[in-house]
């Protein structure tokens, strides 16, 4: 793959946003907004309708107004030096155009500037204005956990408004406000990232296969066409943005276990050698330099933020581990039947996977893969990423795990009626503990999840070339992070070598989980699992996890 084709993997709508709620497997993958807010301060001498940005300029939705007092000094950055009492319309429009490179924080559509204190599109600006101009009483029909993205933003007004408020949209922000230096730097980082994408896009091949695959509709197109021919709720995956829930998958457990394992595309014989796929490379040296220079640092920073926004906060985890154990909750879980514990674990895993889907959307280029490949990667990789995420919830010194809102001794979690189930649970905790002992940073955990999800040659995917390019990009960033933060573990064996060597274990545990689920369903056919869990781990659509 040449430089031009590689860029087609990246959309102009990246990076996306956080989503704290839960829904089902397809809509979340098309949500592409960012979680940061722009907190705004009231200033007494600013005209109505004028918003000061952090660099002393006045921006309105339609024109540029002169300020009545000079800004407190001047600021220089990627937008250039700005000072003095007045700014001409041409200069303000130029800066607004640069901000508009960043997608709408609410739904991921093309933004039109800063509205109500947040970078949004015209559609979300108008929605928020209407919600604030009259008394509204929105109701959510789906547990207040709907995904708000370009496809589904009009389906639930309640969740859309909550997301606007969570991002920091405010009527006060229309009139007054300044971004802090930290917020300004975030915006500048985003603009740099999208400019790097645009530079690569200018050189993109006109016959790229992605040109015909995904076209981003404008705000007006979506606003007028949302309810015409919408596919509805065909499956749990449909609420994450997927029509028809992906390709039919008909292999079964017996065929998976009977198939010989394909040769793994990794080598550890010489751990001083950087990872290279066995097939020819798809990035030339010049483009690798551009990626590392223009994108890699922003990728690390952005993925770390999205990782933090789709996981329990470290402060909360540490607080829970520092509290005395809640005896009543311990007794409650100890009194659970085998069946109750199975279903409770399925609920907890489903909630985690909902956030994993949110995170996957934020991996640059993931949303440019075909819909079928996105679904296949999630079906085959979501359980593996759950193991990685579990490592954050384990205290390896005390042998404890944060399970929901209670800290449990790990030894209490590995008791099972069937020795095979016990081996599964024990294997999961051992894998998670081994990751926790490496003391990865949040950035490294985020990149590691990207590597696990995008591991090349997963069975059934069609876009292996594109997936491999995305994998290489995450690998490059991960290598830089590990080299900067970790010394070799033993001899020339690095932390990265160790992490890559764990991925086959994740595959084995995924298969063991499917086997345990199969046995449980045979003995308890009437128990109902969460829809997303049933869809991802249905034995009617099992993937060959052992391939690749």
Curated annotation (Swiss-Prot):
Ranges where the NR LBD domain occurs: 295-539
Keyword Transcription on entry: yes
ZnF (NR C4-type) residues: 104-124, 140-164
Family annotation (InterPro entries): NHR-like_dom_sf, NR_DBD_ROR, Nucl_hrmn_rcpt_lig-bd, Nuclear_hrmn_rcpt, ThyrH_rcpt, Znf_hrmn_rcpt, Znf_NHR/GATA
Cellular compartments per GO CC: nucleus
Location of the DNA-binding region in this protein: 101-176
UniProt GO molecular function: nuclear receptor activity; RNA polymerase II cis-regulatory region sequence-specific DNA binding; zinc ion binding
Region (Disordered): 1-27, 198-228
Described function: Putative receptor whose ligand is not yet known.
Alphabetical list of PANTHER family matching this protein: NUCLEAR HORMONE RECEPTOR HR3-RELATED (PTHR45805:SF2)
Name listed for the protein in its UniProt record: Probable nuclear hormone receptor HR3
Organism: Manduca sexta
This protein's encoding gene: HR3
